UniProtKB/Swiss-Prot annotation:
Cross-referenced PANTHER family: ASPARTATEAMMONIA/ARGININOSUCCINATE/ADENYLOSUCCINATE LYASE, FUMARATE HYDRATASE, MITOCHONDRIAL
Gene, per the UniProt record: fumC
Subcellular location: Cytoplasm
Enzyme nomenclature, EC number: 4.2.1.2
Family stated for the protein in its record: Belongs to the class-II fumarase/aspartase family. Fumarase subfamily.
A Gene Ontology term for the protein's cellular component: cytoplasm
InterPro entries recorded: Fum_hydII, Fumarase/histidase_N, Fumarase_C_C, Fumarate_lyase_CS, Fumarate_lyase_fam, Fumarate_lyase_N, L-Aspartase-like
Enzyme class (EC, first level): lyase
Positions of the record's site feature: Important for catalytic activity: E324
Alphabetical keyword list: Cytoplasm, Lyase, Tricarboxylic acid cycle
Annotated metabolic or biological route of this protein: Carbohydrate metabolism; tricarboxylic acid cycle; (S)-malate from fumarate: step 1/1
Note: There are 2 substrate-binding sites: the catalytic A site, and the non-catalytic B site that may play a role in the transfer of substrate or product between the active site and the solvent. Alternatively, the B site may bind allosteric effectors.
Active-site feature positions: H181, S311
Protein name: Fumarate hydratase class II
Organism: Listeria innocua serovar 6a (strain ATCC BAA-680 / CLIP 11262)
Length: 455
């Protein structure tokens, strides 16, 4: 069954079971590109915005109370996910996001009209009143981005941080050999090493919390080119106030709407902090899989939980699969950052027309990082253990303990001891005594791996 919808280009048939209208249907047919659909977070953010705008328009006497309430009720249904099937458009559409704005307008109008009597809601005249796609889409971008950061990414960072804190405390007294340039270095404790990973998360969370303030100012009220044509002078401020009430987040009206429509440097800036997190997660995961390499022919200082068979041909193999997954996600996020950076540079004159691809990649980064961090935390970090016998053996066998002799016999003599031990494949202690530079008693007094950690 189909019904006929009309727009300024004429008539078009639409599936009678769907709530969208003519402009959505034209976009659905004209942009059959891939399967990357407009993120639901954007649709829900649009609904929050349309509800707020309807309230303000009613307060200003431009929209009837009945229409405002009807629009708000449909927006609530959208936010709750009850109308997801009626938003079929892909990301690869007009760069202003106009078709998705109209998709939301049409669905809201259609469903609202199912409950109203003779007073019909129009997608443009009522739902889109005092608005343009040019200011609503960037507003929805900021709402969706901020909410995703708070509800997804920041909470996962905190949870992983807590696991690392536990591991740090558990292994704070376990001395191991440090490594710089992939070569043996002076000792530290495993807890100290883990504290570096922990600080990566703490600092990146701080970077995010600081940078995400940049996306609190909203473009709404700028309408088509930033002048606010067809909207009241304080429409943006009033809508931002309504959004603060709805969401509990401190959104404001951007003081310069020309900037808000043509530049996406705030999103670009915040994603830089997300990319930084991805970089550090790649570092942490790489450290863990290298320290767990083996179990007998690698470093073998850490033992990974065995979650699944590692090989289809080699029995008993356990692979660092969670490390591999999260590092692939990190690579994807770095790629997303490049896309966002390029797209953000395309603000020609009064409007950036790469908006959908910017927010698609931004939200994908948040989803992938949040999901992979949860998986990595549960299936890797929580079950990660130290192979203490291997760690102890490597400490005892290390030549870099000789560094502790520097203050007592000087760098050159200490270097000769290390070289002799290496050349003759003896212990550092045997080489030190053989050179006559130190006595056995002095060696035992000065070479204390735990003291060398300055713990």
């Amino acid at each position: 069954m189909e019904r006929i919808e009309r727009d300024t280009l004429g008539e078009i048939s639409v599936d009678a079971t769907k709530y969208w209208g003519a402009q959505t249907e034209r976009s659905r047919r004209n942009f059959a590109i891939g399967d990357n659909y407009m993120p639901k977070e954007i649709i829900y953010a649009f609904a929050q915005l349309k509800k707020a705008a309807a309230k303000v328009n009613a307060l200003e006497g431009k929209l009837s109370e009945a229409k405002s309430v009807a629009i708000g009720n449909v927006c609530d249904q959208i936010i709750q996910g009850e109308l997801d099937e009626h938003f079929p458009l892909v990301v690869w559409q007009t760069g202003s996001g106009t078709q998705s704005n109209m998709n939301v307008n049409e669905v809201i109008a259609h469903v609202a009209n199912l409950t109203l009597g003779e007073e019909k809601v129009h997608p443009n005249d009522d739902v889109n009143m005092s608005q343009s796609s040019n200011d609503t889409f960037p507003t929805a971008m900021h709402i969706a981005a901020y909410q995703a950061l708070v509800t997804k990414l920041l909470s996962e960072i905190t949870k992983m941080e807590e696991v690392l804190t536990t591991k740090k405390n558990q292994y704070m007294q376990l001395v191991k050999i440090g490594r710089t340039h992939l070569q043996d270095a002076t000792p530290l404790t495993l807890g100290q090493e883990i504290s570096g990973w922990e600080a990566c998360l703490t600092n990146n969370k701080n970077y995010l919390e600081s940078s995400m303030k940049a996306i609190l100012p909203l473009a709404i009220g700028g309408t088509a080119v930033g002048t606010g044509l067809n909207a009241s002078k304080d429409f943006g401020d009033k809508v931002a106030e309504e959004l603060r009430k709805q969401t509990g987040y401190p959104f404001t009206s951007d003081s310069n709407k020309y900037f808000a429509l043509t530049s996406h440097s705030p999103i670009n800036f915040v994603h830089g902090a997300i990319r930084s997190l991805a970089s550090d997660l790649m570092k942490i995961a790489n450290d863990i899989r290298l320290l767990a390499s083996g179990p007998r022919s690698g470093i073998g200082e850490l033992t990974l939980p065995a979650n699944e068979p590692g090989s289809s041909i080699m029995p008993g193999k356990v692979n660092p699969t969670q490390c591999e997954a999260i590092t692939m996600v990190a690579a994807q996020v770095m790629g997303n950052d490049t896309t966002i950076n390029i797209a953000a540079s395309q603000g020609n004159f009064e409007l950036n027309v790469y908006k959908p691809v910017i927010i698609f990649n931004f939200l994908e980064s948040i989803t992938l990082l949040s999901d992979s961090m949860r998986s990595f935390r549960i299936h890797c970090l929580e079950g990660l253990t130290a192979n203490e016998s291997v760690i102890e053996a490597k400490v005892n066998d290390s030549l870099m303990l000789v560094t502790a002799l520097n203050p007592h016999i000087g760098y050159e003599k200490a270097a000769k001891i290390a070289k002799l031990a290496f050349d003759e494949n003896t212990t550092l202690k045997e080489a030190a005594i053989k050179t006559g530079f130190v006595t056995e008693k002095e060696f035992d007094l000065w070479i204390d791996p735990l003291k060398m950690t300055n713990l």
